[in-house]
Amino acid sequence: VHILSHTLHYGTGVFEGVRAYLTENGPAIFKLKDHTKRLFDAASKIGINISFTEDELNKAQCDTLIKNNLKEGYLRTIVFLGNEGLGLRAKDLSVNVAVAAWEWPSYMDPEAKKNGISVIKSSHTQYENPLHSGNKIIGTYFSNTMALHEALDKGADEALMLDKNGYISEGSGENIFIVKDDVIYTPTTEHCLNGITRQSVMQIAEDLQLQIFEKDIDYEYLLNADEAFFTGTAVEILSLIHISEPTRPRLIS
């Protein structure tokens, strides 16, 4: 990546992350086609034309997994612009695509993954622009990063971000689900990523004939939840067991 890459300076790029799991039939990448489709959708929204087809990128990801001798792992595909011009007016820049793969057993500490994590309400608001909420656009992750660092500095494991209306949005990089009286709730996607793991959990819940609803969820509702968990490609499914609320710390079963 050139030091004057437009993406490095202005965040003009998109990315996707997928996980591969070892099955009885060999390694399999979870929801690969869905992730690649979302990558292309994100690129089109910010005016980037990827010169490869979705099938070609799917094959490239599978090949990368194999060439790295991985049975399980995480793959990151990134689309970034070249260095032919700098400044916001730069046009006709080259479009580059790279795929990386590595072992990443746990996004969190293994003990945290096993026992659950603590979260704290962030002072950083999520997604003012609905364009960004449905895709992984590089330049939109600054507030997420700041929210996570703020949470870690305060002794929590993760941040809980609210939207501009004060409703729960998501974690710094995860969707959230809340269980109350055997009913599952998750925020609408107006101000959060419509995660592919999120979609899978919702489909499984429906297949199991569990009640699940998308709705605006206020912070107080979380404090009174019976259960809560995060979902995401990196984090997979992770229990929330403690809310670091200064005036009312809350343990969740």
Q: Where are the predicted features?
A:
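Helix-start/capping segments and mature chain N-termini
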Residues: 1-63, 67, 86-240, 244, ...
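Hydrophobic alpha-helical segments, chiefly the membrane-spanning helices
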Residues: 252-253
